[in-house]
Amino acid sequence: MTDLESFIRGLPKTDLHMHIEGSIEPQLMLDLAARNGMKLRWDTAEALRGAYQFDNLQSFLDLYFEGCKVLVAEGDFRDVTRAYLRRAHEDGVVRAELFIGPQSFTERGTPLEALMSGVLGAMQEARREHGLSVGLMISVHRHRTEADAMVMLDQIMPWKDQIIAIGMGGAELGNPPAKFARFFKAARDRGFRTTVHAGEEGPAAYVREALELLQVDRIDHGNACLADPDLVRELAMRRIPLTVCPLSNLRLKGVTEMARHPLKTMMAQGLHVTVNTDDPPYFGGYVTENLLACREALDLSREEIVRLVRNGLEAAFVTTEEREILLRQLDDYLARHAVASTS
C-alpha cells in the first residue's frame, strides 16, 4: 500500500450514495441464493463477477434486479447491510447513508416489516460495534407510477423517525423528475429531506427539474448539469451537494475513461461535489478506490482529495452537532498527518 493510499484509506470519509441491494458481493449473493433455494445463472463468485460488464444503465439494472431476488427474509437484509457496513468501516467511512428501494421486494410478497427490521438491525449493530454514523434513505423507482410512490410513502410512515430522506432512482430516460412532483411535495410536507438521481444518463434539464420542481436537498450524480452554465451557477450558489459516483460512471459508460470524468471540472466551477460508491461490488470499488482512481486519472492533489472528503461531511443528512463531530474527526486526522493547506 502506498503512502497516498494509506492516507486516503485512513481519511474519515462519507458514502452518501449507496444502494443496499447493489452492495451484495458475489459470494454472498451465491450464499443467499442457496439459503433461499434459488439457482442463479452462475455457479461461482468468479463467474458472477465476470458478468459485471455493462453497456449502459439499463444493462446494469437488469442484473441488479436479478440480484435483488436473493433477498427474501429479514436475515438476508440484515446480512447484506451488515457486510456493507463492515467493509465501509474498514475503508475509513465514518458516515454512511444507504438507499433501499422496498418496491422491488414488497411486490414479490416480502413484508416491509422484515426488510426494515433487517436493515435497521444491522445499522444499529454498526453504530454499536464500529461507532459508525449511519442513516437510511428510502428510494422509489422512477419507472413506476407516482401513485405507486405515494403508496410506499404511506407504508413507511411507521419508521419515519428512522428514515433520514426520501430518494428516487432507476432508469432516467423517459422518466423525468417532473413525473413525481406531487410525490416529493408530499414527502417534504411530511418532514423528509429529499434527494433524486438526475443527470446520470438524463439531460441537464432533469437536474433543473429536480432542483426547481421537486425542490430536493441533494442531487445524486448530477454530472449532466455542466451542459447548462446557468444551472451550474445556481447549484454552486446554493451549495446543493452532488453525490457523484466516478467508478459507476466509468462502468456504465457515462465516460469512456476516467481521465474524461467531469469531477475536476465540476470542482473547478465551484460545485459541492462528493465522491461515493453507488453499487460497490458491481462497479469495482469502495470510496477509497473511487478516490484513488480519480487521483490517478485526474491528477488530483491531496488538497483536492481532502476537499472532496470535507464536502461529503458537510453534505451529510445529520444534525449540526453531528456534523461538527464528523468535521472534527477530519481536522484531527489532518493535524496528525501534518497535511498542509496546499499541496
Swiss-Prot record:
Key words, A-Z: Hydrolase, Metal-binding, Nucleotide metabolism, Zinc
Enzyme class: hydrolase
The keyword S-adenosyl-L-methionine belongs to this UniProt entry's keyword annotation: no
Obligatory cofactor(s): Zn(2+)
Binding-site residues for substrate, renumbered to this chain: 279
Residue numbers binding Zn(2+): 17, 19, 197, 278
Cofactor detail note: Binds 1 zinc ion per subunit.
One GO term describing the cellular component: cytosol
List of catalytic residues: 200
Annotated site (Important for catalytic activity): 221
Molecular function per GO: adenine deaminase activity; zinc ion binding
Keyword Zinc applies: yes
Stated family: Belongs to the metallo-dependent hydrolases superfamily. Adenosine and AMP deaminases family. Adenine deaminase type 2 subfamily.
Known role: Catalyzes the hydrolytic deamination of adenine to hypoxanthine. Plays an important role in the purine salvage pathway and in nitrogen catabolism.
Stated name of the protein: Adenine deaminase
